[in-house]
A protein has these predicted regions:
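Small cysteine-rich, disulfide-bonded extracellular modules of the LU/uPAR three-finger superfamily
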Residues: 1-84, 88-127
Length: 127
């Protein structure tokens, strides 16, 4: 799978808009680090650290929404972080979408890697 919106989230959005099926969005979205593509279920290539980090987002504009905080991930082993999956729960829940890192970041145990920015875009938009 390429990075992107999960089947779960796509179906929830479409059912909500087109079928009037209620969808309750999560109060908080959580980020999980990965050493490669998280895959269709969001669970592949997971970092050795199981923690998911709370994310905050600015208001959507022009079909995009951007992260407004900077979660920090402390490595517990030597690894390279290449992507992030986003979830609706800190430990269980549903996989929402994944994003590829602009550049993979490598480090050793104790090093900190930050998510400086993440933007989810729905498009193309009608012009």
């Amino acid at each position: 799978m390429a990075y992107g919106v999960s089947v779960y989230l796509a179906n929830k959005i479409l059912d909500h808009i087109c079928r009037n099926v209620a969808y309750t969005p999560p109060a908080t979205v959580y980020a999980k680090m990965h050493t490669g593509d998280p895959g269709a279920a969001g669970t592949a290539n997971a970092s050795s650290v199981a923690t998911r980090y709370a994310c905050a987002f600015a208001a959507a504009a022009s079909g995009s929404i951007s992260q407004s905080n900077t979660p920090e991930h402390t490595l517990s082993a030597t690894e390279s972080i290449a992507g992030v999956s986003f979830w609706d729960h800190p430990t269980a829940g549903n996989f929402l979408w994944s994003s590829q890192a602009a550049a993979s970041k490598s480090g050793a145990s104790g090093d900190i890697i930050r998510i400086n920015t993440d933007t989810l875009t729905l498009g193309p938009l009608a012009a």
